[in-house]
Structures are given as C-alpha cells and as structure tokens.
Amino acid sequence: MMRANRLMGAALVEHDLVKIEDLDGANERLLEIVAQGQARQNTVLGILAYEMKAVREEDVLQYHVDQQGGGAIDLRYYEVPEEYQKGIDTGACWATWSVPFDRKEDFHFVASAYSLSPAVQKYWETQLDGPILWFGTSLEGIADYLGKHESDSVADKTST
C-alpha cells in the first residue's frame, strides 16, 4: 500500500499533475491516516484531490486516457463476470485501488484509480496470467464496487 502510494505520488509529480510541495504535505497526511488505522482512507490521490485540492481526479483520469492510451470505466454500469467477483482479493484491491473486472481472450481488464503507479502495474502483472488493458476509474468507483462486493459476500455467507 505504501509503495503504491509513494510511486503514485511520484508519477503525479513526474507528469506535472501536482507540485512536489503538495506531495510532501499529502505524504505527511497519509502517515497520520495510516497511524489511525483508517485503511480505506489510505490514498495519496484522495488526499491531494479532496483534502488539499491540489489536483482534480478528473485530470488524472484524462491524463491516463490522453497520454497513456488507456480506457476509462465506471464499474457501477458494468456487469462484472461472476468468475471475477468470486476470486477477488479485496485486500489487494484496496491496497492498489484497482479491480480486475473482465477478460477477453488473453487480455485481462483492470480498472484502477492508481494506473499511473508502476508498483500497482507490476503487482497486477504478476498476479494475472496474460497482458493487461488498463482502465482508469475514480477512487469512488473502486470504493463503491469493493464495498458492494464485500456486502454481497457477507450476505452470501449468512444466507448459506
């Protein structure tokens, strides 16, 4: 999680989406959040975008599409195949702000708010068998999807 955040922050600075001073402040705030044990708030992008207003998340998504040739997706409007819903490692998804959501032929589709982070890319490349097509999405989109997935998993366990 810390590596994903550190490299995401570095990528935001490298691509001139945030200033180094803002990243330093966001990293300090991130350490406070980690110390408080608020796992789902552990996002340097969220701090920069929503607490500090140093970058708009939309600008990061637009950079992903325009400069990296990736797609964009809102998982609320996509029916994720059952094979991906059942095998999901929610801990890894929360740590990387990414969700594998489909596969066509040899290609895995991964939605990520952290697609600019080399650590996130490398993690999913080692986890998935085959090439990855990256789709940018919002932090809220990932959080909503994972929250619903976790709620559904709890409901399934209590109904059996």
Question: PLM ranges: what are they?
Answer:
Residues 1-151:
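Non-catalytic accessory regions
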Residues 152-160:
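Cytosolic regulatory modules rich in charged/polar residues
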